[in-house]
């Protein structure tokens, strides 16, 4: 399969370049070339450090566990839950075609199919893809909202539960098409329109949950805000008696405009097929090169590390850190998101603090890199103290969120542990 896709940026649809895809079975590759008008624009910027502003094609080959595209494009691909919905929808359509006596054309979906299955209106960041017919991929169909209002949460929840339990109908999948396929992550979720008309992410409880996960995430996000972190706005809403975490999208302006976004994995050029570990100190280095306000973002990153250590937020991989474009290739740290307490997990960070500390989620590891972050030791200790005092109120904050003692208790070991005691003595 060969495809040629035009790449645009923003609501004004400015042409950035052309993406060429060539795939046969598991052998997939792509090439991106900036358009000469973009290269000549006064406000041009590289979509990522791995795609410098040069003329001509820049190639990328798919690697195991990776994408066929450069990181800037791969960051907008569906994975986890969204990929599952797309695969189930594809299988259901093939079944229906056979029942109608038609042999389906497509047997296996390729990376390009997933990239273009994301709805244009709710795709993460500001990149937009236009097919060979000049149509923006997965644009809103006439008379159909791809990002539904909150009033439809019940319908969304019913459809996602059907997919989870493998009892979905063609109607369930048709409803989720474009609605439940624009976001990454493993848990069931969907883009929705909040009461004020802005985009948000609705995160649903899973049928496999053994604790109140959605409530726990909102608790963590609100604790993070109380600890001085810049975080995505989060609250709980009720849908037919079930708690849905509603997270405000930060890649949109107040009036709905798109903001370019990239993950820390893309900023660092991380190879998903490699066994190499990555470190917060690498993010510090990247901010010093590419950041618009590097030192304030570096201190913010330090505060986030302290918070993660104190609440056992150990799913802090590079795709759970992001950046928003400001101007001419300068980026700022995006608000914190996907923060969760994990009481059942070993206290080891996915992103190591530094090569020397390893995965240890400890106060000692934090303090050992204070000078690398250019934070005075006294200031580093003060930040740890501020965060610890906020985390100490986790039960009260949980009650404010609406959690019962029975719902809070399974989270206790994520908040009450030796590092909290050490933080109090710092």
State what each model feature region is:
Residues 1-318, 322-426:
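Phosphate/dinucleotide-binding and metal-coordinating scaffold of catalytic cores
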């Amino acid at each position: 399969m060969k495809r040629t896709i035009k790449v645009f940026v923003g609501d004004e649809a400015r042409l950035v370049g052309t993406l060429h895809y060539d795939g046969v079975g598991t052998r997939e590759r792509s090439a991106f070339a900036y358009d000469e008008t973009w290269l000549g624009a006064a406000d041009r910027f590289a979509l990522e450090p791995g795609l410098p502003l040069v003329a001509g094609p820049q190639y990328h080959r798919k690697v195991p566990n990776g994408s066929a595209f450069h990181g800037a494009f791969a960051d907008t691909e569906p994975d986890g839950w969204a990929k599952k919905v797309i695969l189930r929808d594809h299988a259901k359509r093939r079944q229906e075609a056979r029942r109608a006596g038609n042999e389906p054309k497509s047997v296996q979906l390729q990376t390009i199919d997933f990239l273009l299955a994301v709805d244009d209106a709710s795709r993460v960041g500001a990149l937009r893809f236009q097919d060979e017919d000049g149509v923006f991929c997965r644009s809103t169909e006439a008379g159909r909202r791809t990002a539904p209002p909150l009033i439809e949460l019940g319908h969304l929840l019913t459809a996602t539960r059907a997919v989870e339990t493998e009892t979905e109908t063609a109607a369930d999948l048709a409803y989720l098409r474009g609605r439940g396929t624009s976001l990454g992550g493993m848990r069931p979720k969907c883009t929705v329109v909040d009461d004020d008309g802005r985009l948000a992410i609705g995160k649903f409880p899973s049928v496999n949950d053994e604790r109140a996960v959605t409530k726990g995430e909102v608790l963590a996000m609100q604790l993070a805000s109380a600890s001085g972190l810049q975080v995505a706005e989060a609250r709980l809403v009720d849908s037919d008696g079930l708690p849905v975490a509603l997270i405000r999208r930060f890649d949109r302006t107040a009036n709905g405009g798109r903001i370019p976004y990239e993950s820390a994995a893309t900023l660092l050029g991380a190879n998903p097929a490699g066994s190499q570990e990555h470190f917060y100190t690498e993010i510090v280095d990247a901010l010093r090169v590419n950041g618009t306000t590097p030192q304030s973002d570096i201190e913010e990153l330090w505060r986030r590390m302290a918070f993660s250590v104190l609440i056992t937020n150990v799913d802090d991989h590079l795709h759970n850190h992001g950046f928003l474009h400001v101007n001419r290739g300068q980026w700022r740290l995006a608000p914190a998101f996907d923060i969760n307490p994990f009481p059942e997990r070993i206290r080891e960070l996915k992103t190591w603090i530094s090569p020397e500390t390893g995965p240890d989620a400890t106060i000692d590891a934090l303090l050992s890199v204070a000078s690398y972050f250019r934070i005075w030791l006294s200031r580093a200790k003060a930040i740890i103290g501020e965060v610890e005092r906020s985390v100490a109120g986790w039960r009260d904050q949980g009650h404010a969120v609406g959690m019962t003692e029975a719902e809070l208790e399974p989270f206790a070991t994520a908040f009450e542990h030796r590092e909290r005691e050490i933080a109090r003595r710092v």
